[in-house]
Curated annotation (Swiss-Prot):
This is Probable potassium transport system protein Kup. It comes from the Bacteria. HAMAP family: Kup. It comes from Pseudomonas savastanoi pv. phaseolicola (strain 1448A / Race 6) (Pseudomonas syringae pv. phaseolicola (strain 1448A / Race 6)). It is a multi-pass membrane protein. GO terms for cellular component: plasma membrane.
Length: 631
């Protein structure tokens, strides 16, 4: 998911079949590996469902119609249309919903809350997906070799740690294999499913939704609860939307209906047919569906598929972190570009090591894919519900859909998502607390950072000197001017930056050209070069420059300044000096945030990556001035 620009460019030039194969490799890894554990979890997950004819057909019917309603209908028909200038993902959707609700501040705040909580849960999902996927693939070895039970966890850890260790080197070289491997995976899923269905074609009756309704009637006490296991078939549905900016809506939709959906349904029905004929196979219906001679090759293919699924989720966490940083919800971090050809391939070390630590703890703590499955559904359904709420706002307030048409539809979508989420709430006390706690911690961090930055800006602005008054004083009492251009980064456009005042106080000089630079991040993913720069001259050698970036643009300030069209402004490297202000926060009893949040914000600010690296400023042309601010 980190290959934003490369895929975005490919979307316009690649042949449809090549783009479809690439989409299968990146988008469908997570949902494509769900057959490894979904049906097993339904009957072995402690829900009390007996392996009977009616129960098997009922569960298959629920899986079938869940995939049709949630993925084929909700995501394909509606969510994928809610693109933010071609970009998808919950952060892009939150920016879109925030724009749609701009005239309603309270509603806008709610959209931000849902967007941030959905994003926070996605990070929890980014830890669970690699753990449960690789564990479920490795568990096939228990069937192939006796006495390997105790080696499953160590082998899974070796694979997962290796996966995280190679992230800094990028995946461009091996990434070309993802598509062909996943296409092979889905073809094998379909073939195994057909093989199983041929043994007991009766399972095809489950296409009739009456079997699903009948399941609820027969199992009134666990009917809704079983949706907590059925939802495992939908894990990865959010990736369809998140990766839309990489491939476009049409290739993702075509891949789903042509290959992925048929393969998944055939495999689930094949597993159901196997269990229908031999209830003992419910202990691992996916692997037992394969002929004995095919078991080891299938384990190898499963391991590759789960690694690809894990890679997509890890890359997705990098991409979403970049969006969140540029929207102002996460402190700036060092971002490493892992490919000279594809600008969008990135690596963020802090995120990588945090995810690796979380994955290791999950594998050691839960030890099996079955135990981990209980933690999985909470993150998935929570993110899906947040997405539906955000899309609802976009449909009603941005697209202006007629309420008579939109409201009943949205009620149905929210009802289904609400049922899935409610079914997973009890799991919070059975292992599902991990993604909720991780999400809550990340939500607190993001909201603390955003609020802290707002308060910091307010404190700095207090008593600030208005720019017109400062320039007037320069005219009356001109200071000594030195050659070159001084660029002062500032968040405000109407006041004198503290760094400029400090420079005047200590050095008693001004440069010939003084540029007050403000960087603005828009709610759109990209800003065209023609709209990148705003320039205004104040006279006396003072200029106001505003640079506009999208939330996936690379903020290269020197390159953007080169786009200025005023001939008198000279930004040549050896004549330009950048002045930065570095604030140190001192928590106090002043109004604002709770003391513990102020202390947390101060810690985050101290450890955040500075403007120098983030804006790609030349190291030897930067002067940083510190200031202390009470909050």
């Amino acid at each position: 998911m980190s290959q934003t620009n490369s895929h975005g460019e490919a979307a316009g030039t690649a042949k449809p079949i090549g783009l479809l194969i690439a989409a299968v490799g990146v988008v469908y890894g997570d949902i494509g590996t769900s057959p490894l554990y979904t049906l097993k979890e339904v009957f072995q997950g402690g829900y009390g469902v007996e392996v009977t004819h009616d129960a098997i057909l009922g569960v298959l019917s629920l899986i079938f119609w869940s995939l049709i309603w949630v993925v084929s209908f909700k995501y394909m028909a509606f969510v994928l249309r809610a693109d933010n200038q071609g970009e998808g993902g919950i952060m892009a959707l939150m920016a879109l919903a925030r724009r749609a609700s701009a005239k309603h501040p309270k509603l806008q705040m709610m959209m931000v809350v849902f967007g941030l909580f959905g994003a926070a849960l996605f990070y929890g999902d980014s830890m669970i997906t690699p753990a449960v996927s690789v564990l479920s693939a490795m568990e096939g070895l228990e069937l192939a070799f006796d006495g390997l039970d105790h080696w499953i966890v160590p082998m899974a850890l070796i694979v997962l740690v290796g996966l995280f260790l190679i992230q800094r080197h990028g995946t461009a070289r091996i990434g070309v294999l993802f598509g062909p491997v996943m296409v092979t995976w889905f073809l094998v899923l379909g073939a195994l499913g057909v093989y199983g269905i041929m043994q007991s074609p009766e399972v095809l009756k489950a296409v009739n939704p009456a079997w699903g309704v009948n399941f609820f009637i027969i199992h009134p006490g666990i009917g809704v609860a079983i949706l907590g296991a059925v939802v495992l078939a939908l894990t990865g549905a959010e990736a369809l939307y998140a990766d839309m900016g990489h491939f476009g809506r049409k290739p993702i939709s075509r891949a789903w209906f042509i290959l992925v959906l048929p393969a998944l349904l055939l495999n689930y029905f094949g597993q159901g047919a196997l269990v229908l004929g031999n209830p003992e196979t419910v202990r691992n219906p996916f692997y037992l569906l394969a002929p004995g001679w095919a078991l080891l090759p299938l384990i190898g293919l499963s391991t590759m598929a789960t690694i690809i699924a894990s890679q997509a989720v890890i890359s997705g966490a990098f991409s979403m972190t970049l969006q969140a940083i540029q929207l102002g919800y996460i402190p700036r971090m060092h971002i490493q570009h892992t490919s000279s050809d594809a600008q969008g391939q990135i690596y963020i070390g802090a995120v990588n090591w945090a995810l690796m630590a979380g994955v290791i703890l999950l594998v050691i703590g839960f030890e099996s894919s079955g135990a981990l499955a209980s933690a999985y559904g909470v993150a998935v359904t929570g993110t899906m519900l947040c997405t539906t709420i955000l899309v609802s706002t976009v449909m009603l307030m941005l697209w202006k859909w007629p309420p008579l048409l939109a409201v009943p539809l949205l009620i149905c979508l929210l009802l289904v998502d609400g049922l899935f989420f409610a079914a997973n709430v009890p799991k919070i006390f059975q292992g599902g607390a991990f993604p909720v706690l991780a999400g809550a911690v990340l939500f607190i961090l993001m909201t603390t950072w955003k609020r802290g930055k707002q308060l910091l800006a307010e404190r700095i602005d207090e008593g600030g000197l208005p720019l017109p008054i400062f320039i007037s004083s320069i005219r009356v009492q001109p200071p000594h001017r030195v050659q070159g251009t001084a660029v002062f980064l500032t968040a405000r456009s109407d006041a004198v930056p503290h760094a400029l005042l400090h420079n005047m106080l200590h050095n008693q000089v001004l440069h010939e050209q003084v540029v007050l630079l403000t960087v603005v991040y828009e709610d759109s993913p990209r800003v065209p070069a023609a709209q990148r720069v705003e320039v205004e001259s104040y006279g006396e050698g003072f200029y106001r420059v505003i640079l506009h970036f999208g939330f996936i643009d690379e903020p290269d300030v020197p390159a953007a300044l080169a786009l200025c069209d005023l001939p008198e402004l000279d930004f040549s490297p050896m004549r330009t000096t950048y002045f930065l202000s570095r604030e140190t926060v001192i928590p106090s009893k002043m109004d604002g945030m709770a003391r513990w949040r102020e202390a947390l914000f101060a810690f985050m600010l101290k450890n955040a990556n500075g403007n120098l690296r983030f804006f790609k400023l030349p190291f030897n042309r930067v002067i940083e001035l510190g200031t202390q601010v009470e909050m």
